Amino acid sequence: MYKIGFIGLGNMGAPLCERLLLKNKVNIFDINKSNLNKMENLGGIVKYELKDICENDFIFLCLPTSEIVEKITIGDNGLINGLKKNVFVIDMTTGEPEVTRKISNILAKKNVNFVDAPVSGGPKGAKEGIIAIMAGCQEIIFQKVKPLLNMISTNVFHAGPTGSGHSLKAGNNLSLIHI
């Protein structure tokens, strides 16, 4: 069984976390108590301090912006202060590739693996397990996180090096604007 943490249980994070809860115990954190209560009722283990999420081997993030991801991961009171070596931080936020690479480079100095894995397909696709997941990281890291990503969706692929997932997602969003 995997030691999993999940931060960000909003409109997208909740159904993604629910998929992981089908086969795992998941430690959960969110600033919104209502979001925590919903996931706790589905089996999530509530952590009231961000630092308590650091005990996990795989930490998923699904947050509103890259700036929030940056603050939570490498900020003054961020995860970086408590993460173990060889942990995997998997960012499912619709983020900015430049910020992603910055976070990844800083975490790499602490021997922490960062994967950008944004999703496309909305909350319904997430709940049904068919959402597209575009992972940006080294191939060897992708192979280690792929079993967990496959628990979320059957539609998972490696987009390329760090930042590629977020770049592909941005391109996807841009193309949808013109439809």
Cite the ranges covered by each PLM segment:
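Conserved small/polar residues in nucleotide/adenosyl-binding loops
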Residues: 177-179
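NAD(P)+-binding Rossmann beta1-loop-alpha1 motif at the extreme N-terminus of oxidoreductases
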Residues: 1-61, 93, 123
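Short amphipathic alpha-helical segments
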Residues: 17-19, 40, 71-74, 101-105, ...
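Rossmann-fold dinucleotide-binding core
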Residues: 4, 9, 94-174
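Rossmann-fold NAD(P) dinucleotide-binding segment
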Residues: 50-61, 66-112
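Structured helix-beta-strand junction loops
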Residues: 23, 42, 55-56, 86, ...
